[in-house]
Amino acid sequence: SRDGFVETIVFNTALMRRRIRDEHLIMEMTEAGQTSRTDIAICYMSDRVDKELLANVKSRIESLHIDDLKMNQQTLAEAMFKRKWFNPFPKFKFTERPDTAVACLLEGKVIILVDNSPSAMILPTSILDMIEEANDYYFPTVTGMYLKVSRAIITILTVFMTPVYLMNPSWIPSMFEFTAVRDVINVPLVLQFLILELCIDGLRLAALNTPSMLSTPLSVIAGLVLGEFAVQSGWFNSEVMLYMAFVAVANYTQPNFEMGYALKFMRLILLVLTAVLDWIGFLLGCLFILCFLIFNKTLSGRNYLNIKLN
């Protein structure tokens, strides 16, 4: 069997205490919800935690006025940090692994455990934390760095590959000329990309609602059959299908599901702006994404692009 958090908060605190048997590990119990009165544990290392962040977290939890925590830690997260409805980037990182939670504690972060939830909430969180995978630390240093760099490159390609291609389909290095569009399709490229984005989400939702024994065969068969007939019918270019297949697979390299959709929305904005204003729209889209990340703040008010702990 493998160690992991469960729905009982007492067991979860014990799993963390087994790994850190130090007097500086503090677990403060409180509760939220006027009706549910759900137990909450605020865990931190007293000699490493950012005191300002800790005070901020405590004050936010104490000032909560909600009836219950219907969705456990997700309800708590939304109540603690009410972000704008148009902001898709996650402000909290969740993990079901005690080793990951303990590693974050030793880095000076705050862990919040909610009763009836098998996940731990990690604060503060930056975009770099979202694309980081816990398994990277179980490999040698060179391998771990390679996986991190590869994931970062794939993340960038996921956002910019299709908009760059849409901006100038003929602008391809000689060694990659085999990827150039040769089929004459009446459907504009931008519509092809947007339709395929919707189709990929449709296949993903279908796989989620399909019995587990059939989900994988259904995804493979549906993707192959629909892709083949979509190209043969003249609706899509085969090259466009290739790029969108890469994007679809690259989305699964994101450890955080919510971050994958945030990157998807940024890619859609870039696609639309590039289609309307060409290279000017692409530059405006890049500037918009950059400003969005720069002015996006974490729970402690720090920059979302990076976090420096005490």
Regions found by a protein language model. Name each.
Residues 119, 125-270:
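Transmembrane alpha-helical segments that form the functional core of multipass membrane systems
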Residues 238-310:
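Hydrophobic alpha-helical transmembrane segments of membrane transport and translocation systems
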Residues 1-189, 301-310:
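Cytosolic regulatory modules rich in charged/polar residues
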Residues 19-23, 60-67, 104, 108, ...:
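Conserved, well-folded catalytic cores of nucleic-acid-processing
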